[in-house]
């Protein structure tokens, strides 16, 4: 997969328009987690090289459940087997909306636990067997309906992005 970081950001660090489709769990309403994110981001702001980072906005804190398609990454192994690589973005949105109109697996909570702090993210994993099973069911369902299965599907590292390193240190 190509490095999309330079495409995601303007030179001044602001986010560029970056269209695509991904299934996420929005976390910005989780008060306990947001307190931790605020502490981590405040420490980042104290770094002498903070200008090389863009911190994730508070209202965008999420955990990616499964990546789907990105307009800027039209490579076969990162694309739907059901759609041509040149499919217009709106057709992709419409296709996924139809395929995932029924999303029956969201009734139960999924509990995650922190495994470690990465350079730019909090690494997490399912906290119990039920959560691991539910998360895998969701990922399998979406993958099958969307025709998308990235090479790292079975070993995806769940994480919560605190920020993005735009310029190498």
Describe each region flagged by the PLM.
Residues 1-169:
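Histidine-dependent nucleotide/RNA phosphoesterase domain, centered on the 2H-phosphoesterase fold
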